Curated annotation (Swiss-Prot):
Membrane topology note: Multi-pass membrane protein
Domain of life: Bacteria
SS bond list: none
Species per Swiss-Prot/TrEMBL record: Shigella sonnei (strain Ss046)
Function: Part of the high-affinity ATP-driven potassium transport (or Kdp) system, which catalyzes the hydrolysis of ATP coupled with the electrogenic transport of potassium into the cytoplasm. This subunit binds the periplasmic potassium ions and delivers the ions to the membrane domain of KdpB through an intramembrane tunnel.
Record's subunit section: The system is composed of three essential subunits: KdpA, KdpB and KdpC.
Protein name per Swiss-Prot or TrEMBL: Potassium-transporting ATPase potassium-binding subunit
Gene designation: kdpA
Localization per record: Cell inner membrane
GO CC, alphabetical: plasma membrane
Length: 557
């Protein structure tokens, strides 16, 4: 079993790196504001039609463009969900959503979280899924990538005030990266057996003679961007464990690759744009080390079996509870770590049914800020915050002004970095405390004791860090939970983007200083270790007390 697990992890990472390297070169061209071959004429036409200017923007203008697009998308999606019964492509005549569920869902998909307090096949029409959720899957992913484009330019430019044009970046990211790659993935899913139609739900007779209603819909097109954009919201309630979404072992492997593809490619692009590929490799090494350790821990925990089931006399040589027999323990463990290391949230197994230790690792990966590969764009700018913090700590230890890639890291940048890092832990801990203090929060818990608290902690961690996966056992479709999680998702997304853009605006105005003998190398194994230690230290200090009340207490009981 250990050899199989090692081979699975090694194969996954090898194929991932092979695919991400050329994509990273393409992204580097876009960051450097170089149109891809054959696209310049199309871009000029598309900008001329709505009269959009392609002038360079400072960080405030860039930020306002990103926020404006997302707020408009939030309003449109909210009213679309409220009135979906008036809209076309609703063969099941599904009613509109309640205001709190519509708000929660709109915020969820605009913030790239895709938390779902509903069952897709019984709640949303084809139009809502396709014109509402899928469109936001593209736009939220493009927004995250655009932010990291601007942040990377802050290190490659000097004595300037501009970071590019948000509309140009959003257009290029969507048209030349997300749409083509998602189209290829969708066609592959269709070839493998995923659904893509607009038929009414089909009544069929089962082998037992009973009648069953099979949901239909444009699944493959949404499934592709759901994975590629690290969105994670399933067309069906069972998400990627549903055979209509994820029909074969091959589609399952491709889904995992799609989740990590752009975050990995952005690391390669970062190294290429900065002129030092070692910087990109340093980030990949740090992410990969944490990732491999976490996968190993989850695999080990799940292979050991569930002692609670064993005490009841059930066969628990390995923990198959809540897992698809098509995929098994090892693949389910790998998928769980992939989807929570990235801010995806798609699932092929019930994380609530993992062992206490096996479920704690995905929760902790979210709590450290989704920086181990992370979401498209958001993962890299989240990890870059820890890079700046690690550089600052190293500067304090050696008595030098911290600098990274020739840019001095001053008090302003460190205040903004600390603010950005503290946003999501504050939301998680305060949100979980509020839920446990109120009757409305506790009434949604279906399980008592440490595991019940773990479900609450997981839900708030998932929302605040824009992941979207969940422990079951929490009845989250209530006004209290819909509003609480919507607030966490909104602030967890934009409360980090705003200081990140402010840091970029500060750094781009500075001159690059040449490296000297006293400059801390930020590309070697020493800095990789320092960066990993910084991530672990912040995560440990922040969440150990909360984890001790939940999964740790459950593991020791």
């Amino acid at each position: 079993m250990a050899a199989q697990g090692f081979l699975l992890i090694a194969t996954f990472l090898l194929v991932l790196m092979v695919l991400a390297r050329p994509l990273g070169s393409g992204l580097a061209r876009l960051i450097n504001d170089i149109p891809l071959p054959g696209t310049a004429g199309v871009e000029r036409i598309l900008f001329r039609l709505p009269g959009v200017s392609d002038h360079e923007m400072n960080w405030k203008q860039y930020l306002c463009a990103i926020l404006g697009l997302n707020m408009l998308g939030l309003a449109v999606l909210f009213f679309m969900l409220l009135g979906q019964h008036y809209l076309p492509l609703n063969p099941q005549q599904l009613p509109g959503l309640s205001w709190d569920l519509a708000l929660n869902t709109a915020v969820s998909f605009v913030t790239n979280t895709n938390w779902q307090s509903y069952s897709g096949e019984t709640t949303l029409s084809y139009f809502s899924q396709m014109a509402g959720l899928t469109v936001q899957n593209f736009l939220s992913a493009a927004s995250g990538i655009a932010v990291i484009f601007a942040f990377i330019r802050a290190f490659t430019r000097q004595s300037m005030s501009t970071l590019g044009n948000a509309w140009v970046d959003l257009l290029r990211i969507t048209l030349w990266v997300l749409v083509p790659v998602a189209l290829l993935i969708a066609l592959f899913f269709i070839q493998q057996g995923a659904l893509q139609n607009f038929l009414p739900y089909q009544a069929v007779n089962t082998v037992e003679g009973a009648q069953q209603l099979l949901p239909m819909g444009p699944v493959a097109s949404q499934e592709a961007i759901k994975m590629l954009g690290t969105n994670g919201g399933g067309f069906f309630n069972a998400n990627s464990s549903h055979p209509f979404e994820n029909p074969t072992a091959l589609t399952n492997f491709v889904q995992m690759l799609a989740i990590f593809l752009i975050p990995t490619a952005l690391c390669f692009a970062f190294g290429e744009v900065t002129g030092d590929r070692r910087q990109g490799r340093m980030l990949l090494w740090a992410m990969s080390v944490i990732f491999v350790i976490c996968v190993g821990v989850v695999m080990w925990a799940e292979v050991q079996g569930n002692p609670h089931l064993l005490a009841l006399g059930a066969d628990s040589s390995i923990n198959m509870e809540g897992k698809e027999s098509r995929f098994g323990v090892l693949v389910s463990s790998l998928f769980a770590v992939v989807t929570t290391a990235a801010s995806c949230g798609a699932v092929i197994a019930m994380h609530d049914s993992f062992t206490a230790l096996g479920g704690m690792v995905p929760m902790w990966l979210m709590q450290i800020g989704e920086v181990v590969f992370g979401g498209v764009g958001s993962g890299l700018y989240g990890m870059m915050l820890f890079v700046l913090l690690a550089v600052f700590i190293a500067g304090l230890m050696i008595g030098r002004t911290p600098e990274y890639l020739g840019k001095k890291i001053d008090v302003r940048e460190m205040k903004l970095t600390a603010l950005a890092i503290l946003v999501t832990p504050t939301l998680v801990l305060m949100g979980a405390a509020l839920a446990m203090m109120t009757d409305a929060g506790r009434s949604a818990m279906l399980n008592p004791g440490p595991h019940g608290f773990s479900e609450v902690l997981y839900a708030v961690s998932s929302a605040a860090n824009n992941n979207g996966s969940a422990f079951a056992g929490l009845s989250a479709n209530s006004p209290f939970w819909n509003c609480l999680l919507a607030f966490c998702m909104f602030v967890g997304r934009f409360g980090v983007i705003i200081p990140v853009m402010a840091i970029a605006g500060s750094l781009v105005s500075k001159k690059s200083q040449p490296a000297s003998s006293g400059t801390l190398p930020t590309h070697g194994p020493l800095f990789v270790g320092l960066l990993i230690g910084t991530v672990l230290l912040v995560g440990a200090l922040t969440f150990i007390p909360a984890l001790a009340l939940g999964p740790v207490a459950e593991y020791l009981s």
